[in-house]
């Protein structure tokens, strides 16, 4: 088979199963409204849960830092790219979340891959929730360690897998809030099981940090859990981008030596780090609390309305509210029907989610108003098959 044939066959297979991904060009993709092709839509696809991507205080912090530092960091943090803005943000994050150290990464994908590939060795075992993010599972597959996957949120299955003999070390991997299902992991029980088997715990709290817990400290803080490795990302609740790993002093020093994604990548711009510090300040303030409370009320309003209709929701009380459709083509038709009525929603299909669970992944944000939720419910009820 030639290179071209391989490429063509892969694309043909995606088209045949209605799983071909497409990008849409938008003029504005975050906030209450999405603008595309000159038309304005209510935006139910953004991960900007607290509406901070448009916050004037955060925008101003980025602008002022760009004037001071320029628009790029100039290199890896190991060369010349670790500025006072990066250092300040790491210290603020560590203090906020109660860890000795925080290390910044350019993305959550990079952070997850860096930690797993740097730590895991031959004869080690990774035990991951089967619905863990692609960055976690890909890192596990690329590492020399054995990967075992436990049934989603099934702590008994997790315990059985950890009980089987392992020559090396074991790492349990889960998420705080699951990106496609919107539900939460039983973190306290998972941590108890991991410690009983002398395993370390890695929690990716991309969709919980900033949005849940006291001062927005996330799902782990809310559940009284402190994993050995906590990954937080900044493209959701923080409204910016990037990520950080929270850990001990020795693990941070180890990652600075052996995490290739950290050593060999240009660090985030200092202006971005300063904007993230400004975002953190908002998240921790009374304004941040009010934004979280408003979002929680909108989620409750949506779930109450959908539960009275023909749609069935998953047990998700986060900003992520998936409507399981099942069939790929039906999910695409439903997304298009909503767009025709001025609501932008995204159809999520395999391989992002398991076969037979195609869905609309609806996301609610603090930028929405109650009337927006009511409009979405009205359109959904009219579009339901």
From Swiss-Prot:
NCBIfam families to which the protein is assigned, alphabetical: bioF
Name assigned to this protein: 8-amino-7-oxononanoate synthase
In-chain residues carrying the UniProt-annotated modification N6-(pyridoxal phosphate)lysine: 236
GO molecular function per UniProt: 8-amino-7-oxononanoate synthase activity; pyridoxal phosphate binding
Cofactors named for this entry: pyridoxal 5'-phosphate
Residues the entry annotates as binding pyridoxal 5'-phosphate: 108-109, 179, 207, 233
Superkingdom, natural source: Bacteria
Pathway involvement of the protein, from the record: Cofactor biosynthesis; biotin biosynthesis
Alphabetical UniProt keywords: Biotin biosynthesis, Pyridoxal phosphate, Transferase
InterPro entries per the UniProt record, alphabetical: Aminotrans_II_pyridoxalP_BS (IPR001917), Aminotransferase_I/II_large (IPR004839), AON_synthase_class-II (IPR050087), AONS_Archaea/Proteobacteria (IPR004723), AONS_Proteobacteria (IPR022834), PyrdxlP-dep_Trfase (IPR015424), PyrdxlP-dep_Trfase_major (IPR015421), PyrdxlP-dep_Trfase_small (IPR015422)
Its EC number(s): 2.3.1.47
Catalytic activity, as annotated: 6-carboxyhexanoyl-[ACP] + L-alanine + H(+) = (8S)-8-amino-7-oxononanoate + holo-[ACP] + CO2
GO biological process terms held by the UniProt record: biotin biosynthetic process
Family: Belongs to the class-II pyridoxal-phosphate-dependent aminotransferase family. BioF subfamily.
Source species: Salmonella paratyphi A (strain AKU_12601)
Xref: Pfam families: Aminotran_1_2
Binding site for substrate: 21, 133, 352
Subunit details: Homodimer.
Disulfide bonds: none
PANTHER family in the cross-refs: 8-AMINO-7-OXONONANOATE SYNTHASE (PTHR13693:SF100), CLASS II AMINOTRANSFERASE/8-AMINO-7-OXONONANOATE SYNTHASE (PTHR13693)
Family annotation (PROSITE patterns): AA_TRANSFER_CLASS_2
Described purpose of this protein according to its UniProt entry: Catalyzes the decarboxylative condensation of pimeloyl-[acyl-carrier protein] and L-alanine to produce 8-amino-7-oxononanoate (AON), [acyl-carrier protein], and carbon dioxide.
């Amino acid at each position: 088979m030639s290179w071209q044939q391989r490429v063509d066959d892969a694309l043909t297979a995606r088209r045949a199963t209605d799983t071909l991904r497409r990008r849409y060009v938008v003029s504005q993709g975050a906030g209450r409204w999405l603008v595309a092709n000159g038309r304005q839509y209510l935006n139910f696809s953004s991960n900007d849960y607290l509406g901070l991507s448009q916050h004037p205080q955060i925008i101003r912090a980025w602008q002022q830092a760009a004037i001071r530092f320029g628009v790029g960091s100039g290199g890896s943090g190991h060369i010349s790219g670790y500025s006072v803005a990066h250092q300040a943000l790491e210290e603020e994050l560590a203090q906020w979340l109660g860890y000795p150290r925080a290390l910044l990464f350019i993305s959550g994908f990079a952070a997850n891959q860096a930690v797993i590939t740097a730590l895991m060795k031959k004869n080690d075992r990774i035990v991951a929730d089967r619905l863990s993010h692609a960055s976690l599972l890909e890192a596990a597959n690329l590492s020399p360690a054995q990967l075992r996957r436990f049934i989603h949120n099934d702590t008994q299955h997790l315990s059985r897998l950890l009980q089987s003999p392992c020559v090396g070390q074991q790492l349990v991997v889960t998420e705080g809030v699951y990106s496609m299902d919107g539900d939460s992991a039983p973190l306290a029980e998972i941590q108890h099981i991991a410690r009983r088997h002398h395993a370390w715990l890695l929690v990716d709290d991309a969709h919980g940090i900033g949005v849940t817990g006291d001062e927005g400290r996330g799902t782990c803080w809310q559940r009284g859990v402190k994993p050995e490795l906590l990954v937080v990302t900044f493209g959701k609740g923080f409204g910016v981008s990037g990520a950080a790993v929270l850990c001990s002093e020795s693990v941070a020093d180890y990652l600075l030596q052996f995490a290739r994604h950290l050593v060999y990548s240009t660090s985030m711009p200092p202006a971005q780090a300063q904007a993230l510090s400004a975002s953190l300040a908002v998240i921790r303030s009374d304004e941040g609390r009010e934004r979280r409370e408003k979002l929680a009320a909108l989620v409750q309003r949506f779930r109450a309305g959908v539960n009275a209709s023909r749609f069935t929701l998953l047990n998700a009380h986060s900003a992520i509210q998936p409507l399981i459709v099942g069939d790929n083509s039906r999910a695409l038709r439903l997304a298009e029907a909503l767009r025709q009525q001025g609501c932008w929603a995204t159809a999520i299909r395999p391989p992002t989610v398991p076969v037979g669970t195609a869905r609309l992944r609806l996301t609610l944000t603090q930028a929405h108003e109650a009337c927006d939720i009511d409009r979405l419910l009205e359109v959904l009820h009219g579009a339901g098959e």
